[in-house]
């Protein structure tokens, strides 16, 4: 029996049994688990200054934001560089703050957004502050660098050398969301995280920490044809926990490449066949690596840091600085020009 247990740990559950014997289970009850933030804390910091920028990971665009008070970060996927798409992404962020009782008073951004922000100013009554030519918003540039570092670190943990567009999009969103899960240095509270301040659900180990991003899973595939030979599970790549209250999972179907949501999954060790399937999907979309690009979708190679942006402040805010981080060349990489050079 010990040999069988060892084999199960190495090879995981029997996939044929999962595909043939899995049955539907009773859904989990809906339980609201949101920490109540003192109203005085929200009232005191109600007016927010927001810094925004655009970043590309391969061909996938994101509007990145960070505020100067709560330090909440977001990366909203955009499908094009049109003003309508920028407006849609910004509306997602503003609704999040407004829903928690905060008001965006000023938006700091590069001149690229000037035409768009005239509409935002009129519709949403937000004050705009545009940088001078060749200048940048320091908080936005540091935020891009921080998100980029987290994406690159997470990518290095994956067994895949290339990932498709869907996985890139969720990788950026997941890494950005994780930066909001714990109290930040320079924020408004040493006890409440940015996510808690905006009324997002609390971190639950059983819901949010069971399966890592990029894992190979068998997702329960419910069908009304119970007497047929239709498979009971689907091959999928794990993306992130679902955002609903009862729990669930957002996945990439390995057969179609589309995002699906399932209530229950079973993690299976990643095999060479799975790795080849993911990399083939990425190669078909023209992705062979992970590259960070500017708003013109041009790859920026390592160069000097952007003038006027104090990257030491980013280290102070994101993590406790140690001597190795500052003295041994954390900045020798000189990545910021990989981001939007606006």
Roles of regions detected by a PLM:
Residues 164-213:
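Active-site-proximal acidic segments at structured loop/helix or strand boundaries
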